[in-house]
Amino acid sequence: MEHYISLLIRSVFIENMALSFFLGMCTFLAVSKKVTTAMGLGVAVIVVLAISVPANQIIYQGILAPGALAWAGVPDADLSFLKFITFIGVIAALVQILEMTLDKYFPPLYNALGIFLPLITVNCAIFGAVAFMVERDYNLTESLVFGVGSGIGWALAIVLLAAVREKMKYSDVPNGLRGLGITFISAGLMALGFMSFSGVSL
């Protein structure tokens, strides 16, 4: 149990997808103008990661990994070259289901997220978490914990940045830095803050 708690904390703070690996920066910067919208997208990312990482782990270990098809009588088969397109297909299917659900039950949030909701499909934070899962050879439980933790970490980062940007609307920001300029600086300072967690040993 201690191992899973450690993995969760590490994936939220120490190995934050947005502020440590700088993954998913396009939506991170574009949707972080309002806290409510950022929270909505953050929850969507948590849901997609919590499902896609363990789902892709099952597919990879059961079908694509070298020797995974031993149960089918072909122990020498290696379909790992199909992993990228398979992972993207699974992520795209999950995002499509999420998009239809939000459109039906949460229209205001669906309209607020706009084009950025389908862009979760190509959000490199989602694919990055799946790729890390394969590289680190996580089992199913570890994949679930890592997916949830990575989603929470990314959501935390975008909500914090959105809160900072809302405050900056009423600040005296120099003309040359208004907009994305001060946003990049703020995100960089947040990343420096999260970097302090890198010395924590779990």
Swiss-Prot record:
The gene is nqrE. It comes from Shewanella denitrificans (strain OS217 / ATCC BAA-1090 / DSM 15013). Belongs to the NqrDE/RnfAE family. Its EC number is 7.2.1.1. HAMAP family: NqrE. GO terms for molecular function: oxidoreductase activity, acting on NAD(P)H, quinone or similar compound as acceptor. This is Na(+)-translocating NADH-quinone reductase subunit E. Composed of six subunits; NqrA, NqrB, NqrC, NqrD, NqrE and NqrF. The chain crosses the membrane at residues 11-31, 35-55, 79-99, 114-134, 144-164, 180-200.
